[in-house]
Amino acid sequence: GALTIACAKGNPQGEMVGIDRWGKEYASFNKSLCESNAAAEEVKNTCFLSGNAVLLDFPDESFDAVTSNYVYHNIARADKQALLMETLRVLKKGGVFAIHDLMSPTRYGNMQMFVERLKEQGYEQVELIDTTKGMFMSPKEAKWLMLRGSALIVGKK
C-alpha cells in the first residue's frame, strides 16, 4: 500500500489502484491496513484490491501508468518476463511504467534482450537501470542486503 499511497500523494488528480495478494505468508498485510494507512495520510484517491499479478483482472490498456517495487521475485514458479508482459498488457498506449525488482538472470533471464524486444514492439524510452550502483545503494550494500541484481525497468508504451 505504501507505493500506492505515495503515488496518490504525488498525483492528487489521478485515481491509484493498489493490487496485492494478501493472506498466507503476508497475513500481517491486508486491505484494511492499506486503507487505514491511506486514511492516516489523508489520501482519498486510492483503491486497494486483491489480485494476482500472473493474471490481472483488468481489460487491456486500463491504466495510464503501472509501477511495482520488489514484488515479482516473490512469485514462485512464475516466468518473470511473462509477469512483466502481463503488467504491460494493462498499460494504455502512451502510458509509462517503472518496475523495480531483483532482476538477476537466474530469476528473469536475459533482461537486455527483453528490453530490445520491447523496443521492437514499439515501446519507447525503455531503460534497464542497475540500482545497485549508487542510485539507491552501493554494490556493497546490495550484497549485504541480499539485493544483488536489483534493477529498474522504465519506459513508455
Outline where the language-model segments fall.
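Core SAM-dependent methyltransferase catalytic element
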Residues: 119-124, 135-157
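A short acidic, Gly/Pro-enriched loop at the edge of an enzyme's catalytic core
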Residues: 51-66
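Conserved SAM-binding loop of SAM-dependent methyltransferases across substrates and taxa
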Residues: 2-12
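A short glycine-rich, Lys/Arg-flanked "PGG" loop and its adjoining helix->strand segment in the class I
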Residues: 81-93
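Conserved SAM-binding strand-loop segment of SAM-dependent methyltransferases
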Residues: 42-53
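Conserved beta-strand signature within the Rossmann-like core of class I S-adenosyl-L-methionine
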Residues: 17-18, 94-101
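Conserved class I S-adenosyl-L-methionine
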Residues: 24, 98-120
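Helix-to-beta-strand junctions that scaffold the AdoMet/dcAdoMet cofactor pocket
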Residues: 11, 75-77, 91-93
